[in-house]
């Protein structure tokens, strides 16, 4: 087979990051562009087979069941290709040759791969025009394609590294610890590249520099060659909606830097779902599209992963101007209801949770929406602090500061429905929500859902005080709190998910007996008899009447949740299920196992469960 034929079979896609590009391209061709994204100032002249430095070494991203994306930033002009295969040291496949420009990001996607498979790859490069038999060979790395259900795998999580430097020992240790964990992928939930540090500048290249620093081997480059990195923005990346209309917006610059240096998922109609709403402020002529790359979801093994964005659609400033390093050009409205996903993202989240039957469902964002109702360390409540306690309020939980259920007073039911985020999480079997922002480790439970505050890998101490206290409360529990620094390692197996706090510095916990580890059970069929919603052991007309009443909005809360009423497993309990129960009670044959043990693990409860 010729190289051309192999490339066509493997559907290799090349997208230059130093030129116009479009993410999510699904065409069977090589796309090569030559327009420059950044000024080219080669640091050295490369002769044949002369090694060079890479400001951005190989970074893998956007893994799917059949493809991987690799991004590099070389310090000199090069011609290069990748060799790869499924056995270490053996590379039966080779991409076409591509050219990359000095100091500019360059990215290719390799498709046609096999799911649930580890691939080994290496780059070979030389100066453009050098002999085709003379190459510099870089180290071998590897990556996984999508795990199959039932396969055990590891992923890792960090938050709030706050533009850590290479001299930060705890941070560097954390990066090396992540590499030692060999995760299938890593999720970082923000306050990382820290747009605030470029406050006195109005130049895109300063944000680019911050992102390139995180490509170093002291940072995400320690593991990014073999571990895809998923980014979720934090408040200090300044992508809040009220910042995106500035004459020079660091939020927009942050989006553009992320698009250039870190492959991030977009809606592709096949593997990833996500935001399709364009942002006109993004320089389409340079970056190829106006996609925000802010929220997205995918499945891997037995788990669903959902990254949400509380920032870009929050248009009014709820706290004192300048608190997070923004400009002082926006006035404070002081309203915690201002924090929102907006209807489109809210409905996307709802549908994503409802449409998945994964054993585990994990959600991620830097902070919640609304937060607790008190000032923390001199900063007003609008700055959004807290986890399980905060899940009671505003768009997340539906209550206001006066403990009144007023969700639909502030959210149009035609756009948002009648249930706030936490209720959607409960009804759809969310296993855990990982959040940052408060600079400490906190393990909490609310309605069986883990609320996990992620520690910083770069800080020391116990974070902000006045937010969390270990104890059991009326509707949630704060199980344990620990100081920084480190990361989370989550091992997902069919039997359980194990969450471990891997420390990279000295850590103390409350209670002191806490082992920095806990497990999460998978979503399993609910115990009970299918069709029996009143708990009497039978599936009959009494149950059908309860289902019909709940579907009509009548109060049936004393029987809720009524997962056993979803007899046709469509995630709803309605008149269709009632008819099936009545037919079964009358002795008619129905295509559902009514009267058998086991009920759906997660459903949308009928209106009568929340009258």
Locate predicted features:
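N-terminal secretory signal peptides that target proteins for export/translocation
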Residues: 1-21
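Generic short N-terminal amphipathic or hydrophobic helices
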Residues: 11-12, 19, 31, 44, ...
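Sec-dependent N-terminal signal peptides
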Residues: 18-37
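C-terminal segment of classical bacterial N-terminal signal peptides
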Residues: 35-45
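Cellulosome-associated attachment modules in secreted, modular CAZymes
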Residues: 39, 526-611
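Metal-dependent phosphoester/phosphodiester hydrolase catalytic core
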Residues: 49-465, 481, 489-527
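An anionic, turn-rich surface loop/hairpin at beta-sheet edges
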Residues: 467-477
């Amino acid at each position: 087979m010729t190289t051309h034929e192999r490339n066509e079979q493997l559907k290799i896609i090349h997208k230059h990051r130093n030129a116009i590009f479009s993410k999510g391209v699904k065409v069977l061709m090589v796309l090569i562009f030559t327009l420059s994204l950044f000024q080219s100032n080669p640091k050295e002249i490369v002769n044949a087979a002369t090694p060079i430095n890479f400001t951005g070494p190989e970074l893998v991203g956007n893994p799917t069941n059949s493809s991987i994306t690799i991004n590099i930033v070389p310090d000199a002009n090069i011609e290069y290709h990748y060799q790869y295969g499924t056995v270490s040291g053996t590379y039966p496949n080779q991409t076409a040759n591509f050219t990359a420009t000095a100091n500019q990001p360059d990215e290719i996607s390799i498709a046609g791969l096999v799911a649930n498979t580890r691939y080994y790859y290496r780059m070979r490069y030389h100066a453009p025009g050098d002999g085709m038999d003379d190459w510099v060979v870089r180290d071998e790395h590897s990556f996984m394609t999508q795990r199959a259900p039932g396969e055990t795998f590891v992923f890792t999580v960090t938050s709030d590294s706050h533009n850590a430097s290479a001299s930060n020992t705890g941070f560097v240790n954390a990066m090396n610890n992540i590499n030692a964990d060999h995760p299938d992928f890593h999720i970082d939930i923000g306050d990382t590249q820290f747009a605030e540090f470029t406050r006195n500048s109005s130049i895109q290249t300063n944000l680019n520099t911050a992102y390139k620093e995180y490509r170093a081997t002291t940072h995400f480059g320690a593991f990014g060659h073999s571990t895809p990195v998923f980014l979720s923005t934090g408040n200090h990346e300044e992508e809040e909606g009220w910042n995106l209309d500035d004459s020079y917006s660091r939020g927009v610059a942050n989006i553009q830097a992320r698009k250039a240096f870190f492959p991030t998922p977009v809606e592709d109609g096949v593997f990833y779902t996500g935001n399709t709403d364009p942002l006109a402020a993004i320089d389409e002529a340079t970056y190829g599209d106006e996609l925000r790359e802010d929220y997205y979801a995918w499945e891997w093994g037995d788990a669903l992963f959902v990254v949400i964005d509380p920032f870009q659609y929050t248009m009014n400033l709820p706290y004192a101007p300048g608190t997070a390093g923004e400009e002082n050009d926006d006035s404070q409205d002081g309203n915690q209801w201002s924090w929102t996903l907006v209807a489109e993202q809210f409905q996307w989240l709802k549908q994503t949770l409802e449409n998945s039957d994964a054993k585990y469902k994990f959600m991620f964002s830097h902070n919640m929406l609304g937060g607790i109702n008190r000032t923390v360390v001199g900063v007003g409540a609008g700055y959004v602090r807290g986890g399980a306690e905060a899940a009671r309020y505003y768009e997340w939980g539906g209550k206001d500061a006066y403990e009144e259920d007023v969700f639909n007073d502030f959210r149009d039911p035609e756009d948002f429905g009648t249930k706030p985020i936490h209720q959607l999480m409960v009804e759809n079997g969310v296993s855990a929500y990982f959040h940052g922002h408060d600079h400490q480790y906190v393990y909490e439970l609310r309605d069986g859902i883990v609320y996990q505050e992620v520690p910083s890998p770069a800080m020391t101490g116990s974070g902000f005080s006045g937010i969390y206290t270990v104890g059991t409360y009326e509707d949630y529990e704060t199980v344990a709190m620990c100081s920084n620094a480190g990361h989370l390692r989550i091992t997902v197996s069919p039997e359980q998910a194990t969450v471990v706090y891997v420390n990279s510095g000295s850590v103390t916990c409350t209670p002191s007996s806490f082992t920095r580890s806990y497990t999460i059970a998978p979503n399993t069929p609910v115990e009970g008899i299918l069709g029996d919603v009143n708990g009497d052991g039978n599936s009959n007309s009494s149950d059908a009447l309860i289902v019909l009443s709940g579907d009509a909005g009548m109060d049936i809360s004393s029987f809720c949740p009524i997962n056993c009423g979803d007899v046709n497993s469509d995630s709803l309990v309605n008149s269709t299920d009632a008819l099936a129960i009545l037919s079964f009670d009358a002795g008619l044959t129905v295509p559902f196992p009514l009267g058998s043990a086991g009920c759906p693990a997660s459903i949308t409860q009928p209106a009568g469960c929340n009258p």
